[in-house]
């Protein structure tokens, strides 16, 4: 039976200027919030996709993010597709789940 991908958790951070926050800390907050909303633990996540940011430089953002939050995924990648980045990331996550590469992205 083919696997069907779903969005099981969501979370929104504050937007705009958020004193005391970095792009990485906001990425981490969003990830932890979405993981909790899905009823999962960090250890359940086996795939990671990160959107690049223009305010801070991380040559390997997705790998740096995984280290920052303590995730050891089977797959991780940074995505930069301009205004389509969010949609592309959802499509990539669904493809990885449906192909059986990952369970939780």
Question: Model-predicted segments: where are they?
Answer:
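Conserved "HGTGT" condensation-loop signature of ketosynthase/thiolase-family condensing enzymes
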Residues: 1-78, 95-99
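Active-site-proximal alpha-helical scaffold in enzymes
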Residues: 81-105
